[in-house]
A protein has these predicted regions:
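Histidine-acidic metal/acid-base catalytic patches
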Residues: 3-5, 9-16, 20, 26-38, ...
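Alpha-helical packing segments of well-folded alpha/beta enzyme cores
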Residues: 60, 117, 150, 154-161, ...
Length: 354
């Protein structure tokens, strides 16, 4: 995937910005005492709702507000500056925040369009931007040279974007999206040394690369601007282990410890819930393909880290059965997603002060 191509998650974000989604039929407005510091929602958490394309039309920001969320991750800001100003005013009146996903400039010819989008994001009052520039490394690449060439291309793209970010004082948060181990992402950002480029820390993604979530967080901590909060479950399967988002509080993460650490760094950090309701992901650590991009000292995966991860899997069987969506009707899948998001939101409010 090139740095400007759209992942499944970004396509959902695009749809979230374009499709008007209904409240649940039985939903009543949910209070949000934390306002814009309360938990927000990442676009990938709305996948079932977007696909359902229900008939009732409710603006996505209104949906999030009515459902008690403090922020929303969406695709592009309004291209018209008057509309951008209206969005900024609306966010202020609702006491909410927004995070946008904007394609980065793959070539110098793309800088003008990127500049216009960053200006629009700035005028909209964006909290920051997010970019997920990789797929799952162990699926995307079959050898180290191809992985490394992609990484170098991404570095060049971000360096090309940085002057425009600095011009408008808009921050870009790069998600740890199962593509880079945390030490190599941190080393890159240290070398780049820009206050405008940092990390959107996903609580669970780097388990797939044999890292403990707290290790990932600590390695990336100096650069974290925002977070995708989630809880994770793991269980063995024949080629490795399964990795699944589960309700907040039902997984293996020490959420309170992690939230406290992130808030200590930045009391105003934006937490967006990413409770993706889907089949568990297969992490095939016993296959040759998984290890194909880790056979070079520039990007190692030590055997010690594999052993620690397998021990984590062994010692943490799922507390409850992990979610499955295969065979569900669209209506049932939508209800399951709504229920999961609502339960996780309520847990975050009660136990994490979000």
């Amino acid at each position: 995937m090139s740095p400007t191509s759209l992942s499944r998650r970004e396509l959902l974000a695009s749809a979230a910005g374009a499709i008007l989604l209904p409240l649940s039929a039985s939903a009543a407005p949910v209070a949000n005492p934390r306002g814009k510091l309360g938990i927000g929602v990442a676009a990938a958490g709305f996948g079932q709702r977007v696909r359902a394309n229900a008939a009732a039309k409710v603006d996505m920001l209104d949906w999030a507000h009515e459902n008690g969320y403090g922020g929303l991750e969406s695709r592009l800001p309004p291209s018209d500056l008057d509309a951008a100003h209206r969005l900024r005013d609306k966010l202020e009146s609702l006491n909410m925040r927004m995070l946008f996903n904007i394609p980065l400039p793959a070539t110098d010819a793309d800088i003008s369009a990127f500049d216009a989008n960053i200006k629009a994001a700035h005028e909209s009052g964006a909290y920051c931007l997010r970019a997920a520039l990789t797929q799952r490394r162990y699926e995307q690449f079959s050898d180290f040279p191809t992985f490394w060439k992609n990484f170098e291309t991404i570095k060049a793209t971000v360096a090309r974007a940085e002057p425009t970010l600095a011009k408008y004082k808009v921050k870009l948060a790069l998600e740890n999206h199962k593509g880079w181990r945390s030490l190599e992402q941190a080393a890159w950002l240290k070398q780049l040394s820009s206050p405008w480029v940092g990390v959107l820390f996903d609580f669970g993604n780097n388990i797939s690369l044999c890292e403990h979530p707290e290790e990932t967080m600590n390695n990336l901590m100096p650069y974290i601007f925002a977070a995708h909060i989630k809880d994770m479950a793991v269980e063995p399967y024949e080629d490795g282990f399964l990795l699944s988002e589960v309700l907040l509080g039902d997984g293996l993460l020490d959420l309170k410890k992690m939230v406290t650490a992130l808030r200590t760094k930045d009391p105003n950090i934006m937490f967006n819930l990413e409770m993706i309701t889907r089949e568990p992901l297969k992490i095939p650590v016993y296959t040759e393909k998984y290890w194909a991009t880790f056979d070079d000292p520039r990007s190692p995966l030590p055997g010690h880290d594999l052993a620690k991860t397998l021990n984590l899997v062994r010692k943490n069987p799922p507390k409850i059965p992990v979610p499955h969506t295969t065979g569900l009707s669209p209506e049932a899948a939508l209800k399951l997603e709504d229920d999961n998001n609502s339960a996780s939101r309520d847990y975050a409010r009660k136990n994490l002060d979000l």
